[in-house]
């Protein structure tokens, strides 16, 4: 019953907003089989974050690709879950204007979301660190799996996934901040809200007088600022919100 009441409240807040956005983190993709980073079964419990740093990539590109090709393969095998499709549906209904994500799996776009800001890049693309030529990561992954220890461009440059590694600047942060400044409601979904500067996006909306809904399995540093904090499973909760929105539409 509590889930139903929470979902109805979120539906009402979305319907009463003019410019709502979603801000998503790794937690939205765990139901797709992708581990998050900082949770009990998170990626950084198994590996050192150093492996995903630009310094490590530059010093040890062979070891980096050995690590990242395994991660890349698991991401390619993942499919969008009901939460991704729910956000795409909310955008199609005109109820959210953008999805700002920390994820590199590309699942929001696969699910049908159009206006997606990928702050940490997209692992489905790779590029040459010398000439900047773009590559399909599936092609690069196939080469690594066939034994190419360090995948290289035709020019000889080392290829790199088009993702933001630790020590690199975030993609599109100013565009994300512009969108946040124009928003009156943000749904922070599946994010620990600990990674700067991405974690400033929900705060911008809140500081401008907008609403903040946090949907996450673990506590976050911003729970105290939120209008609603929800601990339900994301892939179950968001479709429930859609159902309530449709019900409220029918009754109005």
Curated annotation (Swiss-Prot):
Q: Name one GO molecular function term.
A: zinc ion binding
- Entry similarity comment: Belongs to the sirtuin family. Class U subfamily.
Where would I find the Deacetylase sirtuin-type domain in this sequence? 1-248
Principal subcellular localisation of the protein: cytoplasm
What is written in the cofactor note of this entry? Binds 1 zinc ion per subunit.
Name the catalysed reactions: N(6)-acetyl-L-lysyl-[protein] + NAD(+) + H2O = 2''-O-acetyl-ADP-D-ribose + nicotinamide + L-lysyl-[protein]
Q: Per its UniProt entry, what is the enzyme's top EC class, as one word?
A: transferase
Q: Which GO terms of the cellular component aspect does the record hold?
A: cytoplasm
Q: Which organism is it from?
A: Sulfolobus acidocaldarius (strain ATCC 33909 / DSM 639 / JCM 8929 / NBRC 15157 / NCIMB 11770)
Q: What does this protein do?
A: NAD-dependent protein deacetylase which modulates the activities of several enzymes which are inactive in their acetylated form. Deacetylates the N-terminal lysine residue of Alba, the major archaeal chromatin protein and that, in turn, increases Alba's DNA binding affinity, thereby repressing transcription.
EC number(s) on file: 2.3.1.286
Q: Which UniProt keywords apply?
A: Cytoplasm, Metal-binding, NAD, Transcription, Transcription regulation, Transferase, Zinc
Gene, per the UniProt record: cobB
Would you say which domain of life the source belongs to?
Archaea
Q: Which residues are listed for nicotinamide binding in this entry?
A: 37, 104-105
Q: Where located?
A: Cytoplasm
User: Which InterPro entries does the UniProt record give?
Assistant: DHS-like_NAD/FAD-binding_dom, NAD-dep_sirtuin_deacylases, Sirtuin, Sirtuin_cat_small_dom_sf, Sirtuin_class_U, Ssirtuin_cat_dom
| Annotated binding of NAD(+), by residue | 26, 30, 37-38, 102, 104-105, 120, 191-192, 216, 234
Entry-linked Pfam families: SIR2
Enumerate the active-site residues.
Answer: 120
Q: Which cofactor does it need?
A: Zn(2+)
Residues holding Zn(2+): 128, 131, 153, 155
Per its record, how is this protein called by name? NAD-dependent protein deacetylase
